[in-house]
Amino acid sequence: MKKLEEYVRSIPDFPEEGIIFRDVTSVLQDKDSLKMSIDQMQENLNGLDFDVIVGPESRGFIFGVPIAYNLNKAFIPVRKKGKLPCETVEMEYALEYGTATIEMHKDSIKPGQKVVIIDDLIATGGTIEAITKLIEQLGGEVVKIVFLMELEGLMGREKLKGYDIASVIKYAGK
C-alpha cells in the first residue's frame, strides 16, 4: 500500500515560480488516501480529553466533520465573514497581500470547553492563530491542533507557540 504522502500531488511553480504547491484534492479523490488521511489525523487525538472540534472553511470541514463523527463530538465551523446567520464574533488577520476576516457563532463555544482544531494545512499559521484567539475569546481552551500537511519552511508553528500541534505530513520547504 502507498504511503499517504505519495497521494499528495506536488505542482512546481504554482501559484508562482519557486513554490511547490501541495494539492490536497488528489488525496480526496482516492478512497484509500481519504480514509488514510482521516484515520491518521484522528490517531493524534487518541487518549485526549476534549469536547468539540473546530475547523475552518472549507478544508477544515472536510477533515474535521468525519473525525468529529467518528469520536462522537460536535463540530464547530469557522467561516469567512458574512456567512453565518446568527450573532458572531470575528477576527481579522493578515494575509500575504491584505487582510481577511473569519467568524464563529457567539454561542458555539461554551466557557471551559476543551477544543481541538482540525485543518488540512499549516503554512504561515495566520488563519489558525486567529481561530485560537476567537476560541479563547469565547472562553474555550485549545488543547490540540491537527493538520494533514505542514509547510515547515513558512514557520507557521512559530505563531502557534504554546499549543500542542501535530502534522501527519511535513514538507521542509515552502
Swiss-Prot record:
Its main location: cytoplasm. Its EC number is 2.4.2.7. It holds the Pfam family Pribosyltran. GO terms for biological process: adenine salvage; AMP salvage; purine ribonucleoside salvage. Homodimer. Belongs to the purine/pyrimidine phosphoribosyltransferase family. NCBIfam families: apt, PRK02304.1-2, PRK02304.1-3, PRK02304.1-5. Catalyzes a salvage reaction resulting in the formation of AMP, that is energically less costly than de novo synthesis. PANTHER family: ADENINE PHOSPHORIBOSYLTRANSFERASE. This is Adenine phosphoribosyltransferase. The gene is apt.
